[in-house]
């Protein structure tokens, strides 16, 4: 049996200690040898990102997972800074910027509202696909394959068994993250 591809899980939550849902979701990833869990807020509490280190991590992995809560229709501030600084022209995009070409991007996102809030006419006025479009466009700019996001709606209000079910599905996906086995 072949080895699974190396997965870099970029975890960005400024209040991780208070996020039961994200702690439950991280558990299976932390048990897999081919998955590197990289907590951005733990590594960069001062927001001074080591760009070269981060780019080297990206080079070493085939699947990049961005796990974070949905903050104001986007991601937490440190992840936004990371995206702007690390995915620079000449590295991930623009002339000669093909370091991530052919790699896979998956967003794993927790929300504070129920699924029905993310639809045309719902509380947030737009479907979640529209809200996540900037991430999809960033993946395209980096010549990466966009994988369907995993969403845990109303995360803080989910029953423990529902969170465990999401964590199990996440762990199963992490064991074989490439669509069609990578073919």
Swiss-Prot record:
Catalytic activity: a quinone + NADH + H(+) = a quinol + NAD(+); a quinone + NADPH + H(+) = a quinol + NADP(+)
SUPFAM superfamilies the UniProt entry points to: Flavoproteins (SSF52218)
EC number: 1.6.5.2
Cellular component annotations (GO), alphabetically ordered: plasma membrane
Keywords linked to the UniProt accession: Cell inner membrane, Cell membrane, Membrane, NAD, Oxidoreductase
Entries under InterPro entries matching the protein: Flavodoxin_fold, Flavoprotein-like_sf, K_H_efflux_KefG, KefG/KefF
Gene Ontology BP, a term: potassium ion transport
Record flagged with keyword Transcription regulation: no
Bilayer disposition of the protein: Peripheral membrane protein
Locations listed in the record: Cell inner membrane
Pfam families per record: Flavodoxin_2
GO molecular function: electron transfer activity; FMN binding; NADH:ubiquinone reductase (non-electrogenic) activity; NADPH dehydrogenase (quinone) activity
Keyword RNA-binding in annotation: no
Top-level EC class: oxidoreductase
Function: Regulatory subunit of a potassium efflux system that confers protection against electrophiles. Required for full activity of KefB.
NCBIfam families, alphabetized: PRK04930.1 (NF003430)
Family according to the record: Belongs to the NAD(P)H dehydrogenase (quinone) family. KefG subfamily.
HAMAP family: K_H_efflux_KefG (MF_01415)
Subunit structure: Interacts with KefB.
Protein name: Glutathione-regulated potassium-efflux system ancillary protein KefG
Native source organism of the sequence: Serratia proteamaculans (strain 568)
Higher taxonomy: Bacteria, Pseudomonadati, Pseudomonadota, Gammaproteobacteria, Enterobacterales
